From Swiss-Prot:
Subcellular location: Mitochondrion
Gene designation: diablo
Species classification: Eukaryota, Metazoa, Chordata, Craniata, Vertebrata
Protein name per the record: Diablo homolog, mitochondrial
GO biological process: apoptotic process; positive regulation of apoptotic process
Protein keywords: Apoptosis, Mitochondrion, Transit peptide
Superkingdom per UniProt: Eukaryota
Length: 244
């Protein structure tokens, strides 16, 4: 009777071996490793997805920072205004200076040809001189207008520099003040050149008036001569007529 259970167990084992072949140890290990890799991959991916991702937000700007930004923009705008007015003024002063020297040259040529021209030639040259004088006065009015705008630009830039300094925008304040000094130097140089030309023009006109008066005493000119109207049309500063 005891052999019957053993036979049953052996038969059952045989059936299992035929239906499900035994897998080698190496294949089992590989299968286990692959299974664990899949499990780990799924686990790690699930963990990463579970981590909340926060959005980066810019720090809130303080009122002081906003004021500094605003005053820096004001400083930049005032510097632009100052640059434009400086360019216009310097260019206008240069044109005026050129016109003054042109008038000086015409008057000197006119004086050197006084004894060599008839009345018609003298009148023609005098008309050219009058035209040059009108142009010079127009250019002077133009540069005076630009000078007024330039002075307002300087005042505005100075206020912007002070506002930048008071607001803590030191770099903007220093930049504007340096810009003011540079443009003031440029304008002063142009003014000096114009002043030198005006002094030479006044001296030339004074010499012409004195020469005309001397010649008129020896030989009174006929009425309506352009030379006789020189002293009436020209306004010579008293400082240039004074003899030291």
């Amino acid at each position: 009777m005891a052999s019957l259970p053993r036979r049953l167990i052996w038969s059952f084992s045989y059936i299992l071996r035929e239906s499900f072949p035994i897998v080698s140890r190496r294949n089992c290990v590989s299968l286990l490793r692959a299974s664990w890799r899949k499990v780990l991959s799924v686990g790690v991916g699930t963990s990463v997805c579970a981590i909340p991702v926060g959005q980066r937000s810019e720090p809130t700007l303080s009122s002081e920072s906003l004021i500094k930004r605003a005053v820096s923009l004001v400083a930049d705008s005032s510097s632009t205004f100052l640059s434009q007015t400086t360019y216009a003024l310097v260019e206008s002063l240069t044109e005026y200076t050129t016109a003054v020297y042109t008038l000086i040259s015409l008057q000197q040529k006119y004086t050197s040809l006084l004894d060599k021209m008839n009345s018609n030639e003298e009148s023609a040259i005098w008309q050219v001189i009058i035209g040059a004088r009108v142009q010079m006065k127009q250019l002077k009015e133009q540069y005076l207008k630009y000078e007024s705008s330039w002075q307002r630009a300087v005042s505005l830039s100075e206020m912007a520099a002070e506002a930048a300094y008071q607001s803590g925008a030191d770099q903007a304040s220093v930049t504007v003040r340096n810009h003011i000094q540079i443009v003031q130097t440029q304008v002063q140089q142009a003014r000096n050149q114009a002043h030198i030309a005006e002094v030479q023009l006044a001296a030339s006109q004074t010499d012409e008036i004195k020469r005309t008066i001397t010649e008129d005493k020896g030989n009174p000119p006929s009425g309506g001569s352009p030379r006789s109207s020189l002293s009436e049309e020209e306004e010579i500063p008293e400082a240039y007529l004074r003899e030291d």
